[in-house]
Amino acid sequence: MRISGNGSDISGTVTVPSSKSFSQRCILYAGFSETEARIGPLAFSNDENIALDIIKSCGLNLVISGDYIEISGKFSCPDLINVGESGTSYRISLGLLSARGCRTEITGDRLLAARPIGPLVESLERCGVRFEFKPDGFPVMDAAETIMEEWVIDGSLSSQYVTSVLMASSLKNDRSVIHVLGRTVSPDYLKITEESLDLFGIAAERSGNYYTVTRRSRPEKVYIEIEGDFSSAAVMLVFGVLGSADGIRVRGLKRRSIQGDSVIVKMLADAGADISWDTDTNDDSIICRKSDLKKITVDADRYPDLAIALSITGIFSPPGVEILNPERLRIKESDRLDAIIKMAERYGSHVELRDKILKIQPGEERKPSDITVDSKDHRIIMAEACAIALSGSTGFIKFPHEVSKSYPAFFWELEKLSVKVIP
């Protein structure tokens, strides 16, 4: 796929996809808890489809109605599930399969198998779950003989480990106490877990390093509206404040969202961006225009996805960007730290990495030619595409379909902003 833009004629309206952080949690919990559910709207991103395939493997019935999914039926332990490259579905499923007492083989993408899983496995092993890892890096797990009374989980590497244990404990017991070790990274994602569980009648309340999880009710059916994804919206909002004199409208977002990445609106506004919620409509849309920005600082430990989107400001906004704790970006879908450094240097930016801080500032203005983006990481591809358009260059995206992991319509939406896209 080839894309090009002139860097100044960006305008239009785009719609963001559903929050896969919410949708995956709700889909998986509905299936494993045998709760009849209607969930949507969905973008049917790769990660959402993986969650749907997992519960289908567990015997649940799925009926698609437009961009909604109806879930019903009885759960049965699957012999095999494929988690693809979805870290969220993989980690949550390990906990839920354990709570259901299943003996299941896991398979998936080799890159996901290489990502850390140890703290979650250790936590579940304390409860009696047995894991045997295969040559492909994924386990066969046996939870037939488990005693799930004492829950301890290290949350210092991934909040998804904590999410998995919260969901497992709520499925196994009416009341559980979970001890969370270490400083939890990306804590805002746990708020999404708490809200998701609340939809199923479960209260997850944190006090210090402990969670108390209590079942309050057992709804026969749940109706769940999935809000738009701020992680995906971030790159469009940054695109707008860097390159749209006429402004762009980003639709589908919830104004009072608990998504941690919703802070992107405040971050950009505090940096001087012309960005605001449209109060004249009822569709919860944001309008943003090209602005002179101040330096932006973002903590990759807390906002890893925002760090990718905001790295573009370091290339095109003179005050630049500071990314704190950038090493966190190395353990995502790819080595994202290396990827954004290479992206910035391609445009002549000054890049400095030391003392747990990555600084990016524009250097000699450069309009590179013959850009080839060979990353398979959805977040990197979207950032690279926006950088190409902002620079007025032309570039070749080698694996454009990979954006389907989170934002299947990304390139169609980009076309709406006067970016030339040639499949």
Question: Could you say what each language-model-derived stretch is?
Answer:
Residues 1-423:
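Structural preference for solvent-exposed beta-strand-turn elements
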